[in-house]
UniProtKB/Swiss-Prot annotation:
Glycans are attached at residues 164, 231. The gene is Slc1a5. The keyword Aminoacyl-tRNA synthetase does not apply. This is Neutral amino acid transporter B(0). It catalyses: L-glutamine(out) + L-serine(in) + Na(+)(out) = L-glutamine(in) + L-serine(out) + Na(+)(in); L-glutamine(in) + L-serine(out) + Na(+)(out) = L-glutamine(out) + L-serine(in) + Na(+)(in); L-threonine(in) + L-glutamine(out) + Na(+)(out) = L-threonine(out) + L-glutamine(in) + Na(+)(in); L-threonine(out) + L-glutamine(in) + Na(+)(out) = L-threonine(in) + L-glutamine(out) + Na(+)(in). It comes from Rattus norvegicus. Na(+) 2 binds at residue 398. GO terms for cellular component: basal plasma membrane; centriolar satellite; ciliary basal body; melanosome; membrane; plasma membrane. Residues 534-555 are annotated as: Disordered.
Length: 555
């Protein structure tokens, strides 16, 4: 029986049938080699796995080592035994990590949002933004409801009838009372910054302080004819040196949409911002290898700084457990369940891809500082497209505060139980709505959620002075809040990526999406006497030399 000769491809290379005898012989030899060196093969797989996840393991180990080191130094005398100079040197590596991360937040947020908004057509941009805001709103409401339910079930403030004065740190200042209207006006002021050119304006937010002033009023004093003096509290908006992420987000999105409207004329500027963003991500990859050292000393320094940490855990242990349990349930059950229901993918594999940003969030206690690492991990390890992650994650770092909303609800119920106040249905609904709304304007900075807790307490007529008890342990609870906040941002980006993959969202100009990868920059042709430098040649994809055209450059 004749056997057909092997066929050749157009390039003249003979194709080899993988089912031929030589292929089976090669496969059997490989199997024999694998069986002979099975131990070595498994050892190599373990080494490859460790090398691939080295940064994750180092970051988690650094966080655990920071807790152990901090407790050990506290047992040996703490910050007082070290002295001011030694404690400053002890905490300096952690401070350096924060400064490195904050250094690249400004270019990263601006460039990523401009590139992401410009890469999507207006209809797709609107749909993505609407779905993202809906996801953030639903998850924040769920976290608020979970916080209220846990606080009502565990009753953390019922057994806290008498508080020892040593529980409250003397260095903690009481948070001032803030009106709801002033908080809303602050949100609007920060959305529209007055100056983006000044270097300090981007790192400046508006805040309202209350100043007590004596006012002369006309009138007759009962004891004689003299003007009366009354004391009044007046609101006084001022600027604080904190990064105005909300203002940068609003400006960058609007500017990116404007570049999209320009069409080809704005393509060069879009490519500039994309290249700037890629260079910033290279800096992020370098900083990530310093993150374990910084996280170790950040966590250890904060524990050493606290006074009488044992008494704090004894007095407020039930409140801490309630907050941490709520964050664990929402982060390990609720968010993964939502992700699985909509994507049908393993959510815990997605979580493993963002372990490094989660550990960084625990160490830095700042959603904004974790943003660069989160962008890099969701793109490289979880397969989220750049124009989605760089558009959604900065918005999530500003408006998505699941952890803060849960903590605020637990704290409000805790203070209500502490003061013996019963919460009816109307007050519970008030707590849920106020916590969800106020968490949107909470700054992505350490202790940002505590600043908005006063709004909830004022809404249900609770004393604001009890916030000092919350501040005493906020250094721990706030880290758990930050981990949950950034986890919600990452799951939101993953859900939107799945939505885009299912719907195959069209774009009116696909070449604007990731211009750097799709448009190759070729060197300009040599100038000739007959050639016009303002003319460029366009060749058809077929490569036919006769099919050439000339048109005036749009650049």
């Amino acid at each position: 029986m004749a056997v057909d000769p092997p066929k050749a491809d157009p390039k003249g290379v003979v194709a080899v049938d993988p089912t031929a005898n030589c292929g089976s012989g090669l496969k059997s030899r490989e199997d024999q080699g694998a069986k002979a060196g099975g131990c070595c093969s498994s050892r190599d797989q373990v080494c490859r796995c460790l090398r691939a996840n080295l940064l994750v393991l180092l970051t988690v180990a650094a966080a655990v080592a920071g807790v152990v080191l901090g407790l050990g130094v506290s047992a040996a005398g703490g910050a007082e035994a070290l002295g001011h100079a030694r404690f400053t040197a002890f905490a300096f590596p952690g401070e350096l990590l924060l400064r490195l991360l904050e250094m690249i937040i400004l270019p990263l947020v601006v460039c990523s949002l401009i590139g992401g908004a410009a890469s999507l057509d207006p209809s797709a941009l609107g749909r993505l933004g609407a779905w993202a805001l809906l996801f953030f709103l639903v998850t924040t409401l769920l976290s608020s409801a979970l916080g209220v339910a846990l606080a009502l079930a565990l009753k953390p403030g019922a057994a806290f009838a008498a508080i020892n004065s040593s529980v409250v740190d003397s260095s903690v200042h009481r948070a001032p009372t803030k009106e709801v209207l002033d908080s809303f006006l602050e949100l609007l002021r920060n959305m529209f910054p007055s100056n983006l050119v000044s270097a300090s304006a981007a790192f400046r937010i508006f805040a309202t302080s209350y100043v007590s002033k004596d006012i002369n009023t006309s009138g007759i004093h009962p004891c004689g004819a003299c003007p009366q003096r009354s004391n009044a509290t007046m609101d006084q908006p001022h600027c604080e040196m904190k990064m105005n992420i909300l203002g940068l987000v609003v400006f960058a999105i609007v500017f990116g949409v404007a570049l999209r409207k320009l069409g080809p004329e704005g393509e060069l500027l879009i490519r500039f911002f994309n290249s700037f963003n890629d260079a910033t991500m290279v800096l992020v990859s370098w900083i990530m290898w310093y993150a374990p050292i910084g996280i170790l000393f950040l966590v250890a320094g904060k524990i050493v700084e606290m006074k009488d940490i044992r008494q704090l855990f004894i007095g407020l242990g039930k409140y801490i457990v309630c907050c941490l349990l709520g964050h664990a349930i929402h982060g390990l059950l609720v968010l993964p369940l939502i992700y699985f229901l909509f994507t049908r993918k393993n959510p815990y594999r997605f979580l493993w891809g963002i372990v490094t940003p989660l550990a960084t969030a625990f160490g830095t206690s700042s959603s904004s500082a974790t943003l660069p690492l989160m962008m890099k991990c969701v793109e490289e390890k979880n397969g989220v497209a750049k124009h989605i992650s760089r558009f959604i994650l900065p918005i999530g770092a500003t408006v998505n505060m699941d952890g803060a909303a849960l903590f605020q609800c637990v704290a409000a119920v805790f203070i209500a139980q502490l003061n013996g106040m019963s919460l009816d249905f109307v007050k519970i609904i008030t707590i849920l709505v106020t916590a969800t709304a106020s968490s949107v304007g909470a700054a992505g900075i350490p202790a940002g959620g505590v600043l908005t807790l006063a709004i909830i307490l004022e809404a249900i007529s609770l004393p604001v002075k009890d916030i000092s008890l919350i501040l005493a342990v906020d250094w721990l609870v706030d880290r758990s809040c930050t981990v949950l906040n950034v986890e919600g941002d990452a799951f939101g980006a993953g859900l939107l990526q799945s939505y885009v993959d299912r719907t195959k969202m069209p774009s009116s100009e696909p070449e604007l999406i990731q211009v750097k990868n799709d448009v190759s920059l070729k060197p300009l042709p040599l100038a000739t006497e007959e050639g016009n430098p303002l003319l460029k040649q366009c060749r058809e994809p077929s490569g036919d030399s006769s099919a050439t055209c000339e048109k005036e450059s749009v650049m």
